[in-house]
Amino acid sequence: SVSGDAVFSIETRYHEVAAAALDANFDMVNDICGFADPKMPEVCDARDAAVAKMASPPDLERPGAVEEVDDIYEALKLNGLTDKTIVDPAFGGWSEAKTLEHDRETFDRLREFRGFGQPILVSINRKNFLRDVAGRSTEEALPVSLAATSMAVERGAHVVRTHDVAETRDAALIGAEFARRRVREEGDVDVEELDVTTVREARRHVDRVSGDGDASTDAARHATTRVFELTGLNDEEKGALRAAATETALVLVEGTDGTSLLAIGTPATFGGTATAASGVSSALDAALERITASTR
């Protein structure tokens, strides 16, 4: 027996094992094959049990790694989700093909997984992709893990798997405390402000809500606002930006020095501005190309 609010989880990829464990008073399932067994979600849903779904190739006999972020996202769609599914993008070296850079990109794009509308689990405790950044051994890597834990929670992680429970708890509380406050109100009409900072993050939510992958990219390009400061502009370049802004709804705030300005708009706005102001000067073309490339 244990004290406190411990939750007992059975790690299995087979629905028969999950059913037996849940019927024997286990609380949840950890499926490292990501519902490769198509009956797993049915078993968990029928028992109203939470299930952690780890991204994996769709092979029940050979769990493995999925390398690219887009492929991880698709793997987590396999055989659907239950109301109590927790998605796990699966950090770590499950195969030789998966590199530290793959894990770093997944961590960098962690907010995208909020597009499922489900809780996110991260297993990042002393992982290689973090230790390598700081040049630390496994024994020395606790501070590295704690820093990443705060960042993961701020980016949307709800569950953190760890071997350093007390310290990780504190790091998670700091991440939660200083996460950006968003609107969330329940009523006759519920309102929730989504945590969206990039076009790719917006596209995940648009795709979930509309079910139209073809339309999601265009809609997502209107979802975030970026602010850039341009300096060293001449009068002709500023005039071209003013003219383009009247067509694209780009907001310009001109500096008092006569050569700088702030440009405020969505990725779609900046894309239209780059087209409308094209050809005035190679310097302005290059600056606008850097902006549009960063907002794609």
Language model features with spans:
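Active-site-adjacent loop and "lid" segments of alpha/beta metabolic enzymes
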Residues: 1, 5-8, 16, 28-72, ...
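Haloarchaeal acidic low-complexity proteome signature biased toward cell-envelope/secretome components but also
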Residues: 4, 62-70, 78, 173-244, ...
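Walker A/P-loop NTP-binding active-site region of P-loop NTPases
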Residues: 11
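Phosphate/pyrophosphate-binding loops at sites that engage ATP/ADP/AMP, CoA/4′-phosphopantetheine
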Residues: 72-85
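Active-site pocket-lining segment
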Residues: 88-97, 102-105, 216-224
